A protein has these predicted regions:
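Membrane-helix boundary/juxtamembrane motif in polytopic membrane proteins
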Residues: 151-181, 223-229
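Intrinsically disordered, low-complexity regions enriched in Ser/Pro/Gly/Gln/His and often acidic
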Residues: 5-7, 38-40, 44, 161, ...
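Short low-polarity hydrophobic stretches
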Residues: 17, 93, 150-153
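Low-complexity, intrinsically disordered extramembrane tails and loops of integral membrane proteins
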Residues: 1-40, 223-229
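Hydrophobic alpha-helical transmembrane segments in multi-pass membrane proteins
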Residues: 39-92, 97-147, 168-219
């Protein structure tokens, strides 16, 4: 076998075919070790993230002013729980930035969205204009956070399960459809209250479905990385 070094890059082999088996094995072992280390980090934090979705869903129900009045203790507790969980969600995303940098952006924007949401509740804004001024940035921050979170999940899965990786990108598209639908539904109120109510109901169900699918994906993802590590 003609084993020669690359003339332009001394100390490296011209191509993989010319690399001695012992070096190939060393490279494979190094890559596998790195993947296991990444899987260990991801498995740990994604598992915590999975369990955090459950209190988040409970908080979403308890903080629904249509089910419980704004003055009720249940609503206040649900609102506080929602804010705390929102901040924790962002904090938990941050440690995974060592594997994928997009997790850092997702974490920061998740925290900012939760803090703005908290401000909206604390100030008790009644003016529709002020609700729009504070609520719109909160919505935008939340969308950016979800974009980077879902794309981070897709990125880290690419080396482990490409099909699963694509599912996160598809879920992001459906998430955008649901958000757009909710916005349109609120505008339809100006035309038909009944139609708006039906649309809001449909997209609320869609939101629940997205949350369930996300929960399922997080569980499978955490399980995959924990087993790999």
């Amino acid at each position: 076998m003609d084993e020669r070094y690359d003339e332009k890059n001394q100390g490296t082999w011209a191509n993989d075919a010319q690399m001695p088996d012992i070096l190939k094995d060393g490279n494979i072992l190094a890559k596998e070790t790195a993947k296991k280390e990444q899987a260990e980090v991801l498995g740990k934090w994604l598992w915590i993230l999975f369990w955090l979705i459950i209190p988040s869903a409970i908080a979403g129900i308890l903080s629904n002013e249509n089910l419980f009045g704004k003055e009720s203790g249940v609503y206040i507790f649900g609102t506080l729980l929602s804010m705390v969980v929102g901040i924790l969600y962002g904090v938990i995303l941050l440690p995974m930035r060592g594997v994928e940098e997009k997790y850092r952006i997702a974490g920061i924007f998740s925290i900012l969205a939760a803090v703005l949401s908290m401000g909206l509740e604390v100030i008790q804004v009644e003016s529709p204009l002020m609700v729009l001024v504070i609520g719109l940035p909160t919505l935008i921050l939340g969308l950016i956070a979800k974009y980077y979170e879902f794309h981070s999940h897709a990125a880290v899965l690419r080396e482990f399960d490409l099909e699963f990786s694509q599912k996160w990108l598809t879920l992001w598209k459906w998430y955008c459809v649901i958000i757009a639908g909710m916005i349109v539904s609120t505008l339809v109120v100006l035309i038909s209250f009944l139609l708006a109510a039906l649309l809001i109901l449909a997209f609320t169900i869609g939101t629940a479905v997205i949350a369930i699918v996300q929960l399922d994906y997080l569980y499978k993802m955490a399980k995959l990385f924990r087993q790999y590590a």
